[in-house]
Amino acid sequence: GTTDRWLAISASLEREEAACAPAGGMVLPDGQVVTGRTSDLLGASAALLINALKRLGGIDQDLDLISTHVLEPICRLKTGVLGNKNPRLHSDEVLIALCVSALTNPIAAMAQAQLPKLRGCDAHFTVVLSDVDEKLYRRLGIHVSCEPKYERQRLYFK
């Protein structure tokens, strides 16, 4: 609803200011608010998705669900072989990495099992999302909105 949308907007803007990086906020079905920010390996939409799944699964937010040993080769593939300027994983790529991790990591499997609970949630981002990220969020049934600004260094786009 409207209240959830405002909570998501407020949370994303506060996280962006605190982190000095693009961020997102989401209101979960129980009213909890979770945030995610752009990092070296993940875009804001991917980070928010992982953090939401952790919160829904009761998983420690400080726990890495996906090993950097899994993430880093994907980032290298994107920039080296595929020639992308943006090494960060989009939300669809991080979900694939989560599914692979879930094969050997029961905590990652628990997080993956939370995906259906995202349907109907409100999320807001402090920058315009890539088409890939926006489409994935919509496929998951998440209501998405964005600030009308682009990432300055264009690190966030395909």
Residue ranges and their predicted role:
Residues 1-23:
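Short, basic/aromatic recognition patches
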Residues 1-8, 42, 46, 105-109:
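Electropositive phosphate-/nucleotide-binding environments in soluble metabolic enzymes
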Residues 20-23, 60-68, 122:
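Flexible, glycine/charged-enriched surface loops at secondary-structure junctions
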Residues 23-27, 31:
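Short beta-strand scaffold segments in enzyme catalytic cores
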Residues 34-35:
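Generic structural signal for well-ordered beta-strand positions
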Residues 40-57:
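A short, polar/charged loop-to-alpha-helix boundary motif
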Residues 63, 71-158:
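C-terminal binding/interaction regions
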